[in-house]
Amino acid sequence: MTAERLPHVRVLLATYNGVRWLEEQLESTLRQQGVQVSVVASDDSSSDGTVELLQRWGSRDRIQILPPSANRFGSAHRNFLRLIRDAEPGDADFFALADQDDIWLPDKLLRAVECLSASSAQGYSGNVTAFWPDGRVQLIDKAQPQRSLDYLFGSPGPGCTFVLPRSVFLKLKAFITEQFDRLQTIWVHDWLIYAFVRSSGGRWHIDSSPLMLYRQHGLNEIGVNAGWRAAMNRWKLVRSGGYRRDILAIADATGVANTVVDSLRHLNLADRMALILRVRAFRRRFSECLILAVLLMVMPRG
């Protein structure tokens, strides 16, 4: 970057049947203040006019659409993996992830760039304000102090708040390109990216300022992870073995090998007790530590 030009942020946008919300997302993304913005979009075989809307915007604005895939990705995770692998970095200084249905406040990207520069961090995420069709709003606070191994157990917040410096993105791109097939089975791209940065010794900045309106609706793939329904979904994921499989898959992919991973791999009674005794290193909130301690007792070995 030079003093004469604004920092260039390349936004990686994943879409699937989101035409009813996409225009607001694009407007708020391209109207960011204090930065240059370009968008690379990957669509997962939409049938509702999403691609046509992207093409209309792309003909007049700073949007590139990646060629359609022969087969459906089937999840936002796989779509984002494809975006990171296939998007050309160009001359961008920073890279951000975007969903198709949110509204970004005008200084979202500038704030991320300033936080990364001031903290010398290798990754950025932030709080969001969730909103529902009935008018409800709720702050989603993820800005608790980080723990030494929290990256093994979950994401620092919604992936649509993530911003990475160019040097980190290029390393992530090489990592995903090399392990692309292996990473398909992991469910959540934001958790994987966080683990990639933190496991290699990188610093991560979680911003307490909510600079995005996080739309909630019936078609959210992830959405706000709160309430009894979310608790039931987490319980099912743990009892099915899916949560443990993701932890181990992310640890294996990022090269994390320690006593925690060994205990999770074997998970006999002594391993469970050892993990519970260290649970404060695994989650940022005390309440989440208590929940994880219970889940570690019922987590299946298979």
Q: Model segments located where?
A:
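C-terminal subregions of glycosyltransferases and related glycan-biosynthesis enzymes
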Residues: F175-R182, W187, W191-L192, R198-S199, ...
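Nucleotide-sugar donor-binding/catalytic module of glycosyltransferases
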Residues: T2-W228
